[in-house]
Amino acid sequence: MEAEEPPEARRRCPEALGKASGCCPEAPGKARGCCPEALGKLLPGLCFLCCLVTYALVGAALFSAVEGRPDPEAEENPELKKFLDKLCNILKCNLTVVEGSRKDLCEHLQQLKPQWFKAPEDWSFLSALFFCCTVFSTVGYGHMYPVTRLGKFLCMLYALFGIPLMFLVLTDIGDILAAILSRAYSRFQALLCLPRDISKWRPLLLCRKQTDSKPADEAIPQIVIDAGADELLDPQPSREPASPSCNVELFERLVAREKQNELQPPMRPVERSNSCPELVLGRLSCSILSNLDEVGQQVERLDIPLPVIALVIFAYISCAAAILPFWETDLGFEDAFYFCFVTLTTIGFGDIVLVHPHFFLFFSIYIIVGMEILFIAFKLMQNRLLHTYKTLMLFVCQREVSLPC
């Protein structure tokens, strides 16, 4: 017969099993409490991204409808007709005899305008979607642009709302990337057993964090009525017992303090409970609002060496440069690398034109993430340059002070 387990062992078994399996009796309540917070962190970014995708689809439908319809005036363009007539007159001459006609032909061909050959068929839905992505991402390659008057006004209005929305998405995604880069670099430091020193590049940020964390308790006035209340109000309390007149005066001062606090707008308390499902919506809204207030803070706190971020950028662009020539057969690795760099830095010269821009739409997420990585790199470089400039100015000022008059 098997030995019967003592009751203490039976009582400890569920706890031991719970710890061994990674859960405990309080885990369901904690999981329910963590779900609104996790959803509150993901929901703003997902909403921003969905708004940007919807905005791009609506813009593609508008531009394909405006620029894609046939224009009867474009078929009889007087400017194009005049250009062709002059070109025919130049070509009637014998170019081998008249050498000046060749120069006139070259100068005349330089006056050629690309919009003369823009066809409505070029503005399909996918082409218009590609154009919208180049507008609100501020890339603007230049080989695709609106020609009609209505299309130009629509493009300006579309950019006014699309560019801030794009920057908002970039800021939110930047926090995620900054958290990933910071954790990856911390694990890399732990693997190599490198010391984690406090960064010297962000002293102002640390001071700002300390000052921001101070007034949290000072902003909420508290009234404590106890035996030592007169000690709180009087900086030099007397050791003699309080008289009735002092008690009346103390009570009047407390009432005046309470009335003054009532004039301030009351702060709505946030109740937290894992057993009441009605409070889930309240916790979710509070989590969303708190995360919206912290948008962009993770990027400001990020501090990793510039060679690390430069290596990440090089690897990121190289991956796209190796994939892009599979459908853009005219591009080699060097041209594809150059095109991706010009795109991610929002320079957008327009010297390289994609033959199949529809396939490049699948790289929309790639473009957004790449632009954010470059933004983080530029932010880190800016902090380094500011630190170098401050160090140089301090050195110059100290040298001027040390010089004799």
UniProtKB/Swiss-Prot annotation:
This is Potassium channel subfamily K member 18. Gene3D superfamilies: 1.10.287.70. It is a multi-pass membrane protein. Residues 346-351 are annotated as: Selectivity filter 2. It is found in: Cell membrane. K(+) 1 binds at residues 138-139. The modification Phosphoserine is found at residues 275, 287. K(+) 2 binds at residues 139-140. K(+) channel that conducts outward and inward rectifying currents at depolarized and hyperpolarized membrane potentials, respectively. The outward rectifying currents are voltage-dependent, coupled to K(+) electrochemical gradient across the membrane, whereas the inward currents can be induced in response to activation of Ca(2+)-mobilizing receptors. Homo- and heterodimerizes to form functional channels with distinct regulatory and gating properties. It comes from the Eukaryota. InterPro entries: 2pore_dom_K_chnl, 2pore_dom_K_chnl_TASK, K_chnl_dom. Belongs to the two pore domain potassium channel (TC 1.A.1.8) family. SUPFAM superfamilies: Voltage-gated potassium channels (SSF81324). The keyword Glycoprotein applies. The lineage of its organism: Eukaryota, Metazoa, Chordata, Craniata, Vertebrata. Homodimer. Heterodimer with KCNK2. Heterodimer with KCNK10. Interacts with calcineurin. Interacts with YWHAH, in a phosphorylation-dependent manner. K(+) 3 binds at residues 140-141. Residues 125-151, 337-351 dip into the membrane without crossing it. Residues 272-277 are annotated as: Interaction with YWHAH. Keywords: Cell membrane, Disulfide bond, Glycoprotein, Ion channel, Ion transport, Membrane, Metal-binding, Phosphoprotein, Potassium, Potassium channel, Potassium transport, Transmembrane, Transmembrane helix, Transport. One of its GO terms (biological process) is cellular response to pH. Glycans are attached at residue 94.
